Curated annotation (Swiss-Prot):
It comes from Escherichia coli O7:K1 (strain IAI39 / ExPEC). Belongs to the UPF0060 family. It is a multi-pass membrane protein. Residues 1-5, 52-60, 106-108 are periplasmic. This is UPF0060 membrane protein YnfA. GO terms for cellular component: plasma membrane. Keywords: Cell inner membrane, Cell membrane, Membrane, Transmembrane, Transmembrane helix. It is found in: Cell inner membrane. PANTHER family: UPF0060 MEMBRANE PROTEIN YNFA. The chain crosses the membrane at residues 6-26, 31-51, 61-81, 85-105. Its main location: membrane. Residues 27-30, 82-84 are cytoplasmic.
Amino acid sequence: MIKTTLLFFATALCEIIGCFLPWLWLKRNASIWLLLPAGISLALFVWLLTLHPAASGRVYAAYGGVYVCTALIWLRVVDGVKLSLYDWTGALIALCGMLIIVAGWGRA
């Protein structure tokens, strides 16, 4: 389960980077060349999703919990926003949901 969780975090990071770089280009007038690494990051994101052994819908559902946590880490580290109690609580609930889904992969 640790390997799956780490793979989900890597996947989420690729998705966030792949979306953040075009956001920088559009919102902050960053270089259009940021679209190249963004495309690579999003392609890597898609490829990483294929490495999970479960049905795609189950993978996407479980991945969502890790994405929430990764996005909040990004919010704190990159955007410099202090996380609230609601952020922490929501992340914990999302992560618990992911763990429940992943625990049932072999039984479904």
